[in-house]
A protein has these predicted regions:
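Lumenal/extracellular ectodomains and adaptor appendage modules
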Residues: 1-208
Length: 208
């Protein structure tokens, strides 16, 4: 059966002072099934509707408040995706440019925005960001190499990071965008061991 694995993933969470959190996921996936023999012909594949285990599409679920969703690869926007708003999530049907056969790889970028008030809590000048460290990518997901980058507003002082499972925290860095003077603090987290759906849990990051 088709066996899709995320070989590398970078999840970037950018907190804006304008009431918005921008999330972008860079994903490299590989079909770990039996390797396709010979060359691929889309015509033959569609004509024969062969039983070869190819992944044509997969579903991912975003937060219910997700908006401004985009799906693209190195070539540009991929228009074959479909989006459906459910009661508790936004379902996105992602369809790569080509069906994925055994041994084939795919790279894509999925991005969206969520309102900050759903994830940021404050008491005076102290803030706590609470949101998913890893989110749903596809059913029965396995993520081999994972990086989370949290970009805070310029001038923030980074506090404690709490993870629901063991992770490695790299040294904090600064991210500069247009008109930034002092830079925006970046907290970088790496996984320790493969991640699965059991790791879809919230982190907490304090800052001032």
């Amino acid at each position: 059966s088709p066996f899709l694995v995320v070989t590398h993933m970078e999840r970037v969470v950018e907190v804006s002072t304008w009431g918005n959190i921008a999330i972008e996921e860079n994903i490299d996936a590989r079909h770990n099934g039996a390797t396709l023999k010979g060359s691929f012909s889309r015509y033959e594949f569609q004509r024969e509707n062969s039983g070869v285990a190819a992944i044509k599409s997969f579903k991912t679920f975003l937060p219910a408040s997700a908006n401004g969703v985009y799906y693209r690869d190195d070539i540009g926007n991929i228009s074959t995706s479909a989006m459906r708003v459910l009661d508790d999530a936004v379902e996105v049907d992602l369809r790569p440019r080509f069906p994925l056969f055994g041994g084939w790889k795919s790279h894509y970028i999925l991005g969206y925005n969520v309102p900050i008030y759903e994830y940021l809590y404050n008491s005076g000048d102290d803030f706590v960001l609470k949101m998913r460290l890893l989110d749903h990518i596809f059913d029965d997901q396995i993520v081999e190499d994972f990086t989370l980058k949290i970009i805070l507003p310029e001038g923030s002082k980074v506090g404690k990071f709490d993870s629901p499972f063991p992770v490695s925290r790299l040294p904090d860095t600064l991210h500069y965008t247009y008109l930034d003077i002092s830079g925006r603090p970046v907290v970088t987290i790496k996984n320790v061991g493969d991640l699965t759906e059991k790791n879809i849990m919230d982190f907490e990051l304090g800052f001032k």
